């Protein structure tokens, strides 16, 4: 199947909400290019496909983990045993999905990235999927996933800070997700707040230079940064009822 046809099929699959197939079509495009880069549209389609496939399992894992805690507190050992087995199945799916995109990033997408925004886009993506592994892994595997996340985000940040404007939606999206990593995975609220606040303040200072084409994307992510800052600095945090915001849809980040 030709490149254009696979891209078209990926768009069809997205419309039909058949995201596993959308992933397959975009993987075919990604692996058939050699050293050639994906277009912005193609990389966004790939990102959206994987974000939906992983997002469904992350949501499932959170729900199951919450039920597991409740059953443990009630002492329902039989139920807990069933839940642990089911959670393990979801974790296996999560691992497979993350491994798939991480291999693609390392073997094809990152090596062929030639400009600042695509390098940051893919390194951020690499950080995101290592972070998703760190969400459910334990012990040495969690430590390794967290270290890989930090390494990818830092590499992305170094390029973003020199090659992308503070208002660039990809740079802002990186700051958003990097700060979530500090807060949720490394349990470092101070570092999370500092990173989010710095990104927000630097973008505000240059808001008048923002082009019309990315104004909506950039201001949306700035709002998410501010939402998280409000949540994290609040003295009246409840027990996790508020959802920490991260970039949900890379299709909105050109």
Swiss-Prot record:
<protein>
    <recommendedName>
        <fullName>14-3-3 protein 2</fullName>
    </recommendedName>
</protein>
<dbReference type="Pfam" id="PF00244">
    <property type="entry name" value="14-3-3"/>
</dbReference>
<comment type="similarity">
    <text>Belongs to the 14-3-3 family.</text>
</comment>
<comment type="subunit">
    <text>Homodimer.</text>
</comment>
<dbReference type="InterPro" id="IPR023409">
    <property type="entry name" value="14-3-3_CS"/>
</dbReference>
<dbReference type="InterPro" id="IPR036815">
    <property type="entry name" value="14-3-3_dom_sf"/>
</dbReference>
<dbReference type="GO" id="GO:0005737">
    <property type="term" value="C:cytoplasm"/>
</dbReference>
<dbReference type="GO" id="GO:0007165">
    <property type="term" value="P:signal transduction"/>
</dbReference>
<dbReference type="InterPro" id="IPR000308">
    <property type="entry name" value="14-3-3"/>
</dbReference>
<dbReference type="InterPro" id="IPR023410">
    <property type="entry name" value="14-3-3_domain"/>
</dbReference>
<dbReference type="GO" id="GO:0008104">
    <property type="term" value="P:protein localization"/>
</dbReference>
């Amino acid at each position: 199947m030709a490149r254009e046809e696979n891209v078209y099929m990926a768009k069809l699959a997205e419309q039909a909400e058949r995201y596993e197939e959308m992933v397959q079509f975009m993987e075919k495009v990604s692996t058939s290019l050699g050293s050639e880069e994906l277009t912005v549209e193609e990389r966004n389609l790939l990102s959206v496909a994987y974000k939906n496939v992983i997002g469904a399992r992350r949501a499932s894992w959170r729900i199951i983990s919450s039920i597991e805690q409740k059953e443990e507190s009630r002492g329902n050992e039989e139920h807990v045993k069933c839940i642990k087995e089911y959670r393990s199945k979801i974790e296996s799916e999560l691992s497979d999905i993350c491994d798939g995109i991480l291999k693609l990033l390392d073997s094809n997408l990152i090596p062929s990235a030639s400009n600042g925004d695509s390098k940051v886009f893919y390194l951020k993506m690499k950080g995101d999927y290592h972070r998703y592994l760190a969400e459910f892994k334990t012990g040495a595997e969690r430590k390794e996933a967290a270290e890989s996340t930090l390494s990818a985000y830092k590499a992305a940040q170094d390029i973003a800070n020199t090659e992308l404007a503070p208002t660039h939606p990809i740079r802002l999206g990186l700051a958003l997700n990097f700060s979530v990593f500090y807060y949720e995975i490394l349990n470092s609220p101070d570092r999370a707040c500092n990173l989010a606040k710095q990104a927000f303040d630097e973008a505000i200072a240059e808001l008048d230079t923002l082009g019309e084409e990315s104004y909506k994307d950039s201001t949306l992510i700035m709002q998410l940064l501010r939402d998280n800052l409000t949540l994290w600095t609040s003295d009246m945090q409840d027990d996790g009822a508020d959802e920490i915001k991260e970039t949900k849809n890379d299709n909105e980040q050109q």
